[in-house]
């Protein structure tokens, strides 16, 4: 396993730990999710380039599309919660109230 793969795996793990530990604010959760998606994108792109898989070359672009959709939905939810409640705490996201 090369050093770049280890760094990307470590970035993914740190983002996952950040998502699990700092769940009080919604903005920090969204940033951790974006870090996870970015590290997955880099790992997937490097794997496809190193193995010369031409059939799977669209997978990183599809992952970027899903990451953009996740970011747009997360930011719209953040704006809705912060304008409604005045803060971005995750405790405000009760499914019975939405």
Curated annotation (Swiss-Prot):
Matching InterPro entries: NADH_UbQ_OxRdtase_chain4L/K, NUOK/Mnh_C1-like
Job of this protein: Core subunit of the mitochondrial membrane respiratory chain NADH dehydrogenase (Complex I) which catalyzes electron transfer from NADH through the respiratory chain, using ubiquinone as an electron acceptor. Part of the enzyme membrane arm which is embedded in the lipid bilayer and involved in proton translocation.
Example GO molecular function: NADH dehydrogenase (ubiquinone) activity
Membrane topology: Multi-pass membrane protein
Coiled-coil regions listed: none
Protein name: NADH-ubiquinone oxidoreductase chain 4L
Compartments (UniProt record): Mitochondrion inner membrane
Known EC number: 7.1.1.2
Subunit field text: Core subunit of respiratory chain NADH dehydrogenase (Complex I) which is composed of 45 different subunits.
Major localization listed first in the record, in broad terms: mitochondrion
Family indicated by similarity: Belongs to the complex I subunit 4L family.
Gene Ontology BP annotations: ATP synthesis coupled electron transport
Catalytic activity: a ubiquinone + NADH + 5 H(+)(in) = a ubiquinol + NAD(+) + 4 H(+)(out)
Transmembrane segments: 1-21, 29-49, 61-81
Species per Swiss-Prot/TrEMBL record: Stenoderma rufum (Red fruit bat)
């Amino acid at each position: 396993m090369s050093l770049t793969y280890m760094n990307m795996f470590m970035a993914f793990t740190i983002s996952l730990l950040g998502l699990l530990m700092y769940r009080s604010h919604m903005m920090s959760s969204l940033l951790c999710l974006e870090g996870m998606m970015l590290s997955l994108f880099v790992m997937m792109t490097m794997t496809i380039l190193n193995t010369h898989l031409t059939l799977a070359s669209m997978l990183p672009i599809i992952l970027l599309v899903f990451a953009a959709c996740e970011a747009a939905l997360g930011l719209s939810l953040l704006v809705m919660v912060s304008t409604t409640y005045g803060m971005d705490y995750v405790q405000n996201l009760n499914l019975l109230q939405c």
